[in-house]
């Protein structure tokens, strides 16, 4: 049996998609020292080669890819978008606008000066910013008819130009951003790790520690401890401040009880202490030496670890220190915002949608969750009805046409799906039983949508890529470098000398404005801290939204 592989792939577009994906994802795992190509570059290079060999791609599959991607971007941004936009994100909004306005200005006038074909500059800008949302916005504006097609040009030719520009500039944008993250910190007077340490000191940020579940140990109260207590009740003693442990139970004369703040320990009491292993190890000898007891009932406590989503209006906007976790007998392990783990900063301002990983006795963790929000649903079942319904609403919203005199205007699929995704994400953050999609499932849909979209871009661009490289390759690559680097340098100057931002936060914010996650690892390494993640999370959500709008606006201006 003879199988013509080329004919098989040409006649089976779905098979072609997954063959390119498999090869590209494998290629993306290749490392050059500490640098890894990554999934996007691997898939893009593979699809460009396949496109150059003559393989093509159906526009419908390309469309569903970018629709799923941009919709999931909206869902992820939803919980934090409004908080950043309306409350304390002034600096982050300014930096995002500086990057995008500068990039748009350079790309527009650079494309005009170089007389680039229609659509090529838009794709080049998207690639130089390593921003798929910019590309999505530009292509959707063309497909939806929002942007007029010149009479002498065909729509498919313009879309090919957009794809070619993106493919030519993407690698330039990624490498230049990583190099920026490596070089610019070295050019500062102040070391980046010193900037991070300064924020840590100003905000009472302790050193990062390993996270363990609390453990329970039981001790008998002896004469030494009674002398130390000196008649004070538990509230006056401040056991947690002294030891880092909570007293969960007391057995007195054979009776188990949960103590309140007015309780006074007596000699012979057996107490159950809950705390991290390090806290138990640091206990004063009057607590532990020769006094540990094993009492099955006293130790029978259910320690749980839950992810609590901030929802309460009375909590959002307050500092982490205002939670007074010691009153609830709970331990904070992590703070996650927009899928970025934040430093354990007691002065960080909480926002709706923030996830606090908390451990402690089960009933107390539940009590804390009832106060600040809700426990994240630990379910593998997604609310597909809500997911599909808002997807439909996004498409319908993008089809609505508004007329102003002689001018008709519609948002298009990209903006419509982005807005519906933001709405679903926002509602999910405020209503725990509505619209739940496991984060793993959301990541898979988003990554698969992006990968399919990249396959389509590469296959469509591959057939003309080398022709454009020989004709305008040097000009496009040079312009892409300027679009990638100049806005970042300008944003740095604005942030450092006008906004007076801390350098560690500033670098994270600039990378968030560029939505370039690989560069984030480089900055964290130089800062020897995760503090730059505070800035990254601040700009990431708003930048993703603005980039989609930028792609649409740019193609309208061209």
From Swiss-Prot:
Record localization: Cell membrane
Species the sequence originates in: Vibrio cholerae serotype O1 (strain ATCC 39315 / El Tor Inaba N16961)
Keyword field: Cell membrane, Membrane, Repeat, Transmembrane, Transmembrane helix, Transport
GO molecular function, one term: monoatomic cation transmembrane transporter activity
Pfam families in the record: Asp-Al_Ex, TrkA_C
Chief subcellular location: membrane
Domain RCK C-terminal: 203-290, 291-374
Ranges annotated as spanning the membrane: 5-25, 37-57, 66-86, 92-112, 164-184, 384-404, 407-427, 441-461, 476-496, 504-524, 537-557
GO process terms (BP): potassium ion transport
NCBIfam families from the UniProt entry: PRK04972.1, YidE_YbjL_dupl
Keyword Cell membrane on entry: yes
Lineage: Bacteria, Pseudomonadati, Pseudomonadota, Gammaproteobacteria, Vibrionales
Membrane topology per record: Multi-pass membrane protein
Gene Ontology CC, one term: plasma membrane
Family according to the record: Belongs to the AAE transporter (TC 2.A.81) family. YbjL subfamily.
Name of the protein this chain belongs to: Putative transport protein VC_1145
Coiled coil: none
């Amino acid at each position: 049996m003879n199988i013509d592989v080329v004919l098989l792939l040409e006649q089976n577009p779905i098979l072609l998609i997954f063959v390119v994906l498999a090869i590209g994802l494998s290629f993306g795992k290749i490392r050059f020292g500490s640098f890894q190509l990554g999934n996007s570059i691997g898939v893009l290079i593979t699809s460009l080669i396949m496109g150059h060999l003559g393989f093509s791609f159906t526009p419908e599959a390309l469309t569903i890819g970018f629709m799923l991607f941009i919709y999931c971007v909206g869902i992820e941004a939803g919980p934090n978008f409004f908080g950043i936009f309306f409350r304390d994100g002034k600096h982050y909004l300014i930096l995002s606008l500086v990057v995008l306005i500068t990039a748009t200005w350079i790309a527009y006038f650079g494309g005009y000066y170089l007389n680039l074909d229609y659509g090529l500059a838009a794709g080049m800008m998207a690639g130089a910013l390593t921003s798929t949302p910019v590309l999505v916005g530009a292509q959707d504006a063309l497909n939806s008819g929002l942007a007029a097609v010149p009479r002498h040009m065909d729509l498919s030719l313009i879309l090919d130009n957009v794809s070619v520009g993106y493919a030519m500039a993407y690698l330039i944008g990624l490498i230049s951003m990583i190099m920026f993250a490596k070089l610019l910190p070295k050019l500062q007077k102040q070391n980046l790790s010193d900037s991070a340490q300064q924020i840590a000191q100003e905000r009472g940020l302790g050193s990062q520690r390993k996270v363990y579940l609390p453990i329970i140990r039981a001790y008998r109260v002896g004469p030494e401890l009674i002398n130390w207590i000196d008649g004070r009740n538990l509230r006056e003693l401040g056991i947690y401040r002294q030891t880092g442990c909570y007293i969960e139970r007391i057995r007195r004369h054979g009776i188990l009880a949960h103590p309140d703040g007015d309780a006074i320990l007596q000699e012979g009491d057996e107490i159950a202490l809950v705390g991290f292993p390090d806290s138990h190890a640091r206990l004063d000898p009057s607590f532990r030496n020769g006094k540990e007891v094993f009492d099955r009932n006293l130790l029978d406590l259910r320690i749980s670890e839950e992810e609590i989503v901030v929802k309460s209006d009375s909590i959002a906007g307050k500092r982490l220190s205002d939670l007074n976790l010691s009153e609830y007998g709970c331990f904070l392990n992590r703070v996650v915002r927009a899928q970025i783990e934040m430093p354990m900063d007691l002065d960080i301002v909480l926002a709706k949608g923030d996830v606090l990983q908390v451990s402690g006795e089960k009933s107390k963790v539940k009590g804390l969750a009832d106060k600040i929000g809700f426990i994240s649903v630990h379910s593998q079942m997604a609310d597909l009805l809500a997911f599909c319904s808002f997807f439909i609403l996004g498409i319908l919203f993008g089809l609505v046409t508004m007329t102003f005199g002689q001018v008709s205007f519609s948002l298009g699929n990209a903006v419509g799906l982005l807005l519906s995704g933001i709405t679903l994400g926002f509602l999910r953050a405020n209503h725990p039983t509505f619209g739940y999609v496991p984060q793993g499932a959301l990541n898979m849909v988003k990554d698969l949508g992006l990968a399919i979209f990249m396959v389509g871009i590469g296959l469509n661009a591959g057939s003309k890529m080398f022709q454009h490289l020989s004709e305008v390759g040097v000009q496009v690559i040079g312009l892409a470098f300027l679009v990638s680097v100049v806005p970042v340098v300008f944003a740095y100057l604005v942030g450092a000398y006008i906004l007076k931002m801390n350098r560690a936060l500033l670098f994270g914010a600039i990378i968030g404005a560029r939505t370039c996650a690989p560069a984030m690892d480089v900055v964290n390494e130089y800062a020897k801290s995760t503090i730059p993640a505070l800035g990254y999370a601040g700009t990431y959500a708003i930048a993703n939204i603005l980039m989609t709008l930028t792609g649409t606006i740019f193609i309208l201006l061209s």
